[in-house]
Amino acid sequence: MAVLGITVALLGWMVILLFISVWKQIHSSWNLPPGPFPLPIIGNLLQLDLKDIPKSFGRLAERFGPVFTVYLGSRRVVVLHGYKAVREMLLNHKNEFSGRGEIPAFREFKDKGIIFNNGPTWKDTRRFSLTTLRDYGMGKQGNEDRIQKEAHFLLEELRKTQGQPFDPTFVIGCTPFNVIAKILFNDRFDYKDKQALRLMSLFNENFYLLSTPWLQVYNNFSNYLQYMPGSHRKVIKNVSEIKEYTLARVKEHHKSLDPSCPRDFIDSLLIEMEKDKHSTEPLYTLENIAVTVADMFFAGTETTSTTLRYGLLILLKHPEIEEKLHEEIDRVIGPSRMPSVRDRVQMPYMDAVVHEIQRFIDLVPSNLPHEATRDTTFQGYVIPKGTVVIPTLDSLLYDKQEFPDPEKFKPEHFLNEEGKFKYSDYFKPFSAGKRVCVGEGLARMELFLLLSAILQHFNLKPLVDPEDIDLRNITVGFGRVPPRYKLCVIPRS
């Protein structure tokens, strides 16, 4: 029995030595960036805090430098940390790293749409979507009008609270939801509409679940875990329900399509599909259009909604900042006129606060995973084709040289000594390069106009002492999720 135990131990040790030898051989032959030694099957999982992987990446960067390799399970991942490495990757090597690393929870969207697509249709779908969105006013006067009109509905909903405590999640969320719905479907929803609330709850739940430790594990071990119970099943179910809804809307549009008079984003894609239908490899199908619309709907709603919700919580914590914003709004806009984009140049403090909210909350700290499209030499290392590459946006947004005291909320990070707005090239919450967020212009406009409109008409009132408000996120993974809270909005006299 003792001999058997010794034999098993020796065999186990030999397997480990063999693994080390093979790992070193692969590592040296490719000249990969340095990194911690991975264990069989689990890789470097034990060296990462699943409750805050971005922070773990920061610690590893201190040890191995701004470009390092980790293994998430069997997946080789190259992490880029700091302004120089991230900027070089996103802008100077944007083609080589334009692939999308797989996110198993969104496998149903694989090679479709524009966010999670890593297939041959991605470039053309993205290019045409951007052109179509510009035609419907993305970042221009058309969307300013849409946001201003929707802001009126938001202000009315806030008045209905009559100064009583309420959870802002869906009240605030319905505004960007309706703005993007108008672009996609030429439709808007009442703030109490059951279908709208259902879709927003799916968006909100998925953003939360994707940021939990279990989903970090699942996305790296999906081959082992896909048939096991867990919250990943809920995410996948939610994704399917969202796609079923957008597919139904696409089919409705298809039945009533008039190619001479496109009504919205869906119609424009359907017209292109009709032009392409005789191709042996059609770029557009009803399924691909539905996923593209689902991508836009989720991203266009949840990111702006969460940023606004987090921003209001920050202002509850800092009433002195809210007071300065009221003064600037009163001076530039006055009590009755709706805020406009042209006001931004005269409102440097509001502009700085909006930027600082995005920097401080660091909504998607590790970006979405990229993938090397070919063998690439980067800062003296070789990154093989198919390698997942993560450019950490938090390493820019929390850079201590660019933003002194980055852990503190300070609008002064974006103001010069004269009190004028100061842009920072480190400000990349929407990423950059080939995979930059297609809705950046819309989101920036929404944040400025909606926050200005809310503060033009209301004072924010917390339910607890501002010093007791905790701004820490409740979980971080795919994104940073703010704590749930209630507040009161008091009409300004």
Swiss-Prot record:
Annotated positions binding heme: 437
Keywords: Endoplasmic reticulum, Fatty acid metabolism, Heme, Iron, Lipid metabolism, Membrane, Metal-binding, Microsome, Mitochondrion, Mitochondrion inner membrane, Monooxygenase, NADP, Oxidoreductase
Induction (free text): By ethanol.
Pathway linked to the protein: Lipid metabolism; fatty acid metabolism
Keyword Ribonucleoprotein: no
Any one GO cellular component localisation term in the record: endoplasmic reticulum membrane
GO MF annotation terms: arachidonate epoxygenase activity; heme binding; Hsp70 protein binding; Hsp90 protein binding; iron ion binding; oxidoreductase activity, acting on paired donors, with incorporation or reduction of molecular oxygen, reduced flavin or flavoprotein as one donor, and incorporation of one atom of oxygen
UniProt catalytic activity: an organic molecule + reduced [NADPH--hemoprotein reductase] + O2 = an alcohol + oxidized [NADPH--hemoprotein reductase] + H2O + H(+); (5Z,8Z,11Z)-eicosatrienoate + reduced [NADPH--hemoprotein reductase] + O2 = 19-hydroxy-(5Z,8Z,11Z)-eicosatrienoate + oxidized [NADPH--hemoprotein reductase] + H2O + H(+); (5Z,8Z,11Z,14Z,17Z)-eicosapentaenoate + reduced [NADPH--hemoprotein reductase] + O2 = 19-hydroxy-(5Z,8Z,11Z,14Z,17Z)-eicosapentaenoate + oxidized [NADPH--hemoprotein reductase] + H2O + H(+); (4Z,7Z,10Z,13Z,16Z,19Z)-docosahexaenoate + reduced [NADPH--hemoprotein reductase] + O2 = 21-hydroxy-(4Z,7Z,10Z,13Z,16Z,19Z)-docosahexaenoate + oxidized [NADPH--hemoprotein reductase] + H2O + H(+)
SUPFAM superfamilies xrefs: Cytochrome P450
InterPro entries to which the protein is assigned, alphabetical: Cyt_P450 (IPR001128), Cyt_P450_CS (IPR017972), Cyt_P450_E_grp-I (IPR002401), Cyt_P450_E_grp-I_CYP2E-like (IPR008070), Cyt_P450_sf (IPR036396), Cytochrome_P450_fam2 (IPR050182)
EC number annotated for this UniProt entry: 1.14.14.1, 1.14.13.n7
A matching Pfam family: p450
Keyword Cytoplasm: no
Cellular compartment(s): Endoplasmic reticulum membrane; Microsome membrane; Mitochondrion inner membrane
Ligand binding (substrate): 298-303
Cofactor section: heme
Membrane topology field: Peripheral membrane protein
Transmembrane segments: none
Similarity annotation: Belongs to the cytochrome P450 family.
Complex and partners: Interacts with chaperones HSP70 and HSP90; this interaction is required for initial targeting to mitochondria.
Role of this protein: A cytochrome P450 monooxygenase involved in the metabolism of fatty acids. Mechanistically, uses molecular oxygen inserting one oxygen atom into a substrate, and reducing the second into a water molecule, with two electrons provided by NADPH via cytochrome P450 reductase (NADPH--hemoprotein reductase). Catalyzes the hydroxylation of carbon-hydrogen bonds. Hydroxylates fatty acids specifically at the omega-1 position displaying the highest catalytic activity for saturated fatty acids. May be involved in the oxidative metabolism of xenobiotics.
Protein name: Cytochrome P450 2E1
Taxonomic source organism: Oryctolagus cuniculus (Rabbit)
Upper taxonomic lineage: Eukaryota, Metazoa, Chordata, Craniata, Vertebrata
